[in-house]
Amino acid sequence: MTEYKKVIAQNKKALFNYFIEERLEAGIVLKGSEVQSLRQGKASIEESHATDTGHEVFLYNCHIAEYEKANRFNHATRRPRKLLLHTKEIKKIIGRIRIKGYTLVALSMYFNKKNKVKVELGIAKGKKLHDKRESIQEKDWKRDQSRLIRQK
């Protein structure tokens, strides 16, 4: 059975800049105007990342546009947002991202089947320039292969 996901925002750049070693799902604490703005699809997680502050994990640099109809009760667009994770998951994440070179990157934001906003996180290690070139060459080669197959 396929899981229902209404994708709000994706971070395609993260897949290019990082090796994603592990993926996990987290809830996120939002205000009402933020949820309404997300329903309209006005969000960007291009440069967002998560870090730990003691025993909690926060998502930074995630842009959720202001909701136009929430006049004076609007939210700050790039405020840090708390991620909802189990204690075991938090300890595991903290242990992994304390290792040099690892970071916690937001990969996508979506509504699940219960209409809750979820964030897909990835424990990632940064790619070097030559790794990025390899991934570009690999992508080009796959594109050329599909062209050759279509021509036959």
UniProtKB/Swiss-Prot annotation:
<dbReference type="InterPro" id="IPR020081">
    <property type="entry name" value="SsrA-bd_prot_CS"/>
</dbReference>
<keyword id="KW-0963">Cytoplasm</keyword>
<dbReference type="GO" id="GO:0003723">
    <property type="term" value="F:RNA binding"/>
</dbReference>
<dbReference type="InterPro" id="IPR023620">
    <property type="entry name" value="SmpB"/>
</dbReference>
<protein>
    <recommendedName>
        <fullName>SsrA-binding protein</fullName>
    </recommendedName>
</protein>
<comment type="similarity">
    <text>Belongs to the SmpB family.</text>
</comment>
<dbReference type="GO" id="GO:0005829">
    <property type="term" value="C:cytosol"/>
</dbReference>
<dbReference type="Pfam" id="PF01668">
    <property type="entry name" value="SmpB"/>
</dbReference>
<dbReference type="GO" id="GO:0070929">
    <property type="term" value="P:trans-translation"/>
</dbReference>
<dbReference type="InterPro" id="IPR000037">
    <property type="entry name" value="SsrA-bd_prot"/>
</dbReference>
<keyword id="KW-0694">RNA-binding</keyword>
<comment type="function">
    <text>Required for rescue of stalled ribosomes mediated by trans-translation. Binds to transfer-messenger RNA (tmRNA), required for stable association of tmRNA with ribosomes. tmRNA and SmpB together mimic tRNA shape, replacing the anticodon stem-loop with SmpB. tmRNA is encoded by the ssrA gene; the 2 termini fold to resemble tRNA(Ala) and it encodes a 'tag peptide', a short internal open reading frame. During trans-translation Ala-aminoacylated tmRNA acts like a tRNA, entering the A-site of stalled ribosomes, displacing the stalled mRNA.</text>
</comment>
